[in-house]
């Protein structure tokens, strides 16, 4: 959104020629689109926890470049990794979710399965957990007309086909992406921003692999407007969850990055 400035240090993307070691102890990867309706998308990776990055590299899936990437991946082994993304619909608008896999360290990516039928509105920004070798659960930001909510889909065949589950969140206001993690005790923790009054950061817990969800737990509700959210959560060794997001409150006009540390 907006006008992109000219960067003197801009690097043009190239094809990845050296396989990525997905199991490097300090590995991180980010996937980013250049246009949110038509792509293409780029891949960057790091072997020092994000201090320095290699890339950009072109991201192509089964010959398609209309990938609308946001970062959502699950490492399987040294050379195999699954990504959960969206691509352009038939009308060249965002977006239809899918999953893909590489088996050669990111040199090539192949489509595994589409996540649901093509929507009239959009299904974007998946956040996914692996429940077993063949079972995955993904949560997806959805929009149809004036309705904004969150869907959940479950696969029991390693991403080839997906079954729709009851929606974890029925109303997100103006919409916001999910962050889904699997806790150490096996429960699932879903965090998200709500762009409706009271503007807030919230969480839900599932004890049955996403079939049902707890009531909403409000982490904070002092937002000054709807420009909040885009949550990421991680569980610490002590069991507490660190939930990060951008936020605006009534104390100052600028948006800022914040975190809430809480015990699920």
Locations of regions flagged by a protein language model:
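Asp-box/BNR beta-propeller blade signature and adjacent active/binding-site loops
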Residues: 1-264
């Amino acid at each position: 959104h907006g006008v992109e400035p000219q960067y003197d240090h801009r690097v043009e993307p190239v094809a990845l020629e050296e396989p990525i070691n997905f199991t490097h102890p300090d590995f991180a990867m980010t996937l980013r689109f250049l246009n949110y309706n038509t792509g293409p998308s780029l891949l960057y990776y790091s072997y020092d926890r994000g201090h320095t990055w290699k890339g950009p590299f072109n991201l192509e899936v089964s010959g398609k470049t209309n990938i609308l990437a946001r970062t959502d991946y699950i490492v399987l082994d040294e050379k195999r990794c699954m990504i959960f993304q969206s691509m352009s619909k038939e009308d060249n608008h965002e977006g239809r979710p899918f999953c893909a896999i590489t088996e050669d360290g990111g040199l090539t990516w192949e489509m595994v399965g589409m996540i649901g039928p093509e929507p009239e509105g959009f299904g974007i920004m998946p956040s996914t957990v692996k429940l077993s070798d063949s079972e995955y659960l993904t949560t997806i930001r959805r929009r149809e007309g004036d309705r904004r909510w969150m869907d959940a889909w479950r696969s029991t065949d390693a991403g080839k086909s997906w079954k729709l589950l009851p929606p974890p969140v029925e109303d997100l206001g103006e919409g916001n992406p999910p962050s889904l993690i699997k806790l150490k005790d096996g429960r699932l923790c879903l965090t998200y921003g709500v762009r409706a009054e009271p503007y807030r950061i919230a969480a839900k817990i599932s004890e049955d692999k996403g079939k049902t969800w707890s009531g909403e737990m409000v982490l904070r509700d002092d937002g000054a407007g709807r420009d909040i959210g885009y949550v990421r959560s991680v569980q610490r060794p002590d069991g507490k969850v660190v939930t990060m997001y951008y936020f605006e409150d009534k104390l100052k006009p600028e948006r800022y990055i914040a975190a809430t540390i809480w015990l699920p």
